[in-house]
Swiss-Prot record:
GO terms for cellular component: extracellular region. This is Inactive serine protease 35. The lineage of its organism: Eukaryota, Metazoa, Chordata, Craniata, Vertebrata. Residues 1-17 form the signal peptide. It comes from Macaca mulatta. Disulfide bonds join 150-166. Its main location: secreted.
Amino acid sequence: MLLWLIFFTPGWTLIDGSEMQRDFTWHLRKVPRIVSERTFHLTSPTFEADAKMMVNTVCGIECQKELPTPSLSELEDYLSYETVFENGTRTLTRVKVQDLVFEPTQNTTKGASVRRKRQVYGTDSRFSILDKRFLTNFPFSTAVKLSTGCSGILISPQHVLTAAHCVHDGKDYVKGSKKLRVGLLKMRNKSGGKKRRGSKRSRRETSGGDQREGPREHLQDRVKAGRRRKQSGGGQRVSEGRPSFRWTRVKNTHIPKGWARGGMGDAALDYDYALLELKRAHKKKYMELGISPTIKKMPGGMIHFSGFDNDRADQLVYRFCSVSDESNDLLYQYCDAESGSTGSGVYLRLKDPDKKNWKRKIIAVYSGHQWVDVHGVQKDYNVAVRITPLKYAQICLWIHGNDANCAYG
């Protein structure tokens, strides 16, 4: 009942009076162009890195304030990207950035220094999605599970967005990523299998004739029994099934050079995202990519995401919480989460400018519970990597193969 209220209550009822006058609308904006310049063949990776659900100490929001704004050439280096294919071959694509307008640094939220050193803060506020009515429908059906232990989200008929560290540790690809698979949610019967077809026909043939030749009252009894079963079990059938996964191989993986640094420095948390192309297209409804607004333009300052937390085996876990701090590239938040949920797509629900309904879009990738350098002191945060105009343009290029459909986001 609580989930029903959350997802079917109009968005404006979740906003307090002070926010009623704010513009909570998706606004299309022109984004920079990212153009592929040249592609090089690289040596095949060894796929020997250990998968890490937590990145080593990184430069976070406070640390980034002390760094100079990256130049255009530095941005082009970070946004150049590696592609690793299912046969183990690897390429590097250099890009050029055009029509870039540098944006001012985001003002961070006050009072964000208070943290508790746990991934679950106080009372666990996560929801396990067990009801088939929710589990197999949008937006929960967009969540996927990676064979390396992370989560991800469907953003096209053939693409999954996830965290880069789920497949690459910054220096090499993790073990198991050469034969990476993605699990899409499906429901299975209690018996664990499908009903065999043709069983009625076989029974008729075994009995030696058409069952319509039997007494009429037997047929009526069977009809009545079927009705009783339907009436008694109809309300329970929704929750009878258990979630399982239909696994699909990954055709290729794209990772920004800002993360895949090799031996040329530490991976930058700002670029902890990757795109997976599936070998087979799916038929599920996917979630569109959006550009992350500021906290002030998020209803209640709230974000949402669903993933497969390791402490709840094979259960899809949903949560929503407020954002506590932001920079141009990162969001800090108090969402309760455990390892396994990293790579989940963080989304918002805002008004569609052309319609009266509210629409969900992905605005960040959950990077997980990270140790962040704050003025030389290590502190732990739950971090999400924002979809900026540049990252939107890059991911759009990965999906379409060119920038023709990536002018606005």
